[in-house]
Structures are given as structure tokens and as C-alpha cells.
Amino acid sequence: MSSQETTSAAASERSTGAGLSITILALAGFVIVTTEFLIIGLLPALARDLGISISNAGLLVTLFAFTVMLFGPPLTAMLSHLDRKRTFIVILLIFAASNALAAVSSNIWVLALARFIPALALPVFWGTASETASLLAGPKRAGKAVAQVYLGISAAMLFGIPLGTVFADAVGWRGAFWALTLLSALMALLLALSMPRIEPTAKVGLVEQAKILRDPFFLANLLLSILLFTAMFGAYTYLADTLERIAGIEPAQVGWWLMGFGAVGLIGNALGGRYVDRSPLGSTMAFALLLALGMSASVPAAGSMPLLAMVLVIWGIAHTALFPICQIRVMKAAPQAQALAGTLNVSAANAGIGLGSIIGGLTIEHLGLGAVGYVAAVVALLSIAVAWMTSMQKNRAAL
């Protein structure tokens, strides 16, 4: 065999190994996101079982989100220099142990602890998984690799949460957490067996990494993510209510419409990963425009089921495409501290999700449910303006 053939074979083998590792990271992401959001469908059952109100049970969701937002960036900055393979395995074992603790919890305080611990680990996973996927795939395929990892989010939203809720109805909410315990441990084992060792990045101090927070271009990209997630979840949070109360869809059928929304989102995930590599800010503006069109057209289209379905296809594709677009765009804005940048984007996304839900709720209270899509579309258009100004700022800096 010639040296050229040997080199080609070695490159092919490395590519196959990298692809397998990225796929398993996506599966691990599926388990982690399911762990985060499955509890939403379990709240009534666990509230009854633990003898607490549904509002108090709902604080478990708030606890998780705020923990991710507050602790994610400093923890990721401190741990970003560690061996990635070991980091992922430890995180998945933490999720396994936490889910087991949730399954045996006898009161809300134990369950709160079982939610607090994995919330500390989740942003570290997403920050390092995104950067690791980029390293494994190489700079030319970084966007597609991050999109593949983010496919775990889409799959969890589409299959994990509804199927997990059905599973919990059959075997109880504790059984659902036991299932997640086993899946988390399985993902840790698969990564241990398949992922190549990735050389730790040079240890950079917190002060050095935090310098990205003084970079106007990076901060503009972070603000852009907050605006986009505010727009996305300002309307998406109330989509089920919109389908039922405005479109007149039977409650038993709303779930299938939401499943369809998630299914077309898989297309958006692939498109976002493809185009963000070519133009991070350009792809942001394009999909933000589609998002605004979809959200604002949802109420006018509600009188026709075929037209509504077409609008939701546009909305669903744009909504899911913006997940990998935001992540890789923010990471590209801080190449010297990508893990911290990725985690800051996760925190920004959580801030946007919370802010969007609040804005949507206030819109319903003062303007009615039918105005939610329009208000969210205005925020999306504002994000386009910010993206355009950020692009101009980058072009001026390059001169």
C-alpha cells in the first residue's frame, strides 16, 4: 500500500471515529435534555405523590433553569481545561446518580437536590460538547457537527418528553427517573468505549477567559442570542394554547400538532448547521426573518388547517435552526475561549426563554392571546437589526 493510500485510510478511520463520537454526544444530549424537561409532564403526578401544590412543584423547573443560568459560565471556565472524555463520562454519571436520587426522593427537598446537582453539570456538558464536536470535525464542518449534537435537543423535544410522559403514566414518575438513570449510565459507557482521547486545551485562567466579556463583538452576539430566544419562546411557550383556543383544534389533537412542529424542526436543525458555517450573522438574519413570518402569520392562518400547517412548517424550521446557529455563532465570536462562550450562550438562551415567557404572559394579559405572535415577531425583527449592526461592526473592524 502506498503512503498516500495509508494516509487516506488513516484519515478515513479518524473521520469514522469522530463521527461515532459526535453521534454518541448527540444521544447523550438527548438523555440530558429529556432529564431537564421531562419533569414538566410529571408535575401533577409527583405533586400528588409528595403532597405538595402544583405551583410548588413547578418551582423545580425554575430551580433548574436559574441554576443553569447562574452557575454554568464559571463552572465551565474552571473545568474547560480538563480531559473532555473524562468530563463527559463524569457528567453522565452525575446525571445517573441524580436521576436515581429523584426516583427514591420522599419529599420536595430531596427532589430539589436531585434537580440542582444535574443543573450544575448541564451547561458544562453543552459548552464542552459543542467545542469538542467542532474539534473532532474540524473548522470546515464545525457547524454541521454542532448541529448534530444539537439534534439531541430536537429529538428530546420531539420524542423524549412525550414518550417519557407516556412511559411515566404506565409505570409512574419514579419509573421514568429510573429509566433515565439507566440511559445516563449507558451513555457514559458508550463514550468510555468509543470516544478517542482529546488533548486538554491549555489551561487558561478565569481572568484571561473573562476577557471575552470586554469584547464588544462577542457581547453583541450574546445579546443577539438573548433577543432570539426571547422571540422564539415568547410565542412557542403559548403555541399549544393558540392551537386550542384560536385555531379550534381539539385538545387531544394538539399534541400531534406539536409533534409535527418538532418533526419539521429536524430539517431546521440540519439547515442551520449547514449555513452557519458559511455566514454566522447572515444565517441568523435569514432564519430570524422566517421566524418572524411564521409567528406573525399563525393567527391569520388559524382559520384554514392546510394554511396553518404550512405556517407551522416555516415557524418550526426557523425555530429549531436557530439553536445550532446561535451556539456556533457565539463560539466563533470567541475562538480563544469557546467552551466558556458556548456556556454563556446557554445562559443567554435560558435568560431569553424566561424573558420570552414573561413577555408572552404579559401580552396575553393586556392584549390577548392573538397578539402573542405579533409581539414575538417584533422582537425577532429587532434581533435582525442587531445582527445587521453587529455585521457592520465586524466589517469596520476588519478594515
Language model features with spans:
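Helix-breaking motifs and short loop linkers at transmembrane-helix boundaries and internal kinks
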Residues: 51, 83, 104-110, 248, ...
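Conserved MFS/SLC helix-loop-helix module at the cytosolic interface between two early adjacent transmembrane helices
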Residues: 70-109
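Helix-to-loop junctions at the C-terminal end of transmembrane segments
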Residues: 71-83, 268-280, 364
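Paired small-residue
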Residues: 94, 98, 109-117, 306-314
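Helix-loop-helix hairpin linking two adjacent transmembrane segments in secondary transporters
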Residues: 110, 139-193, 238, 242
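Cytoplasmic helix-loop-helix junction between adjacent transmembrane helices
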Residues: 114-152
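Intracellular juxtamembrane helix-capping segments at the cytosolic ends
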Residues: 125-137, 321-334
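C-terminal transmembrane helical hairpin of 12-TM major facilitator-type secondary transporters
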Residues: 282-326
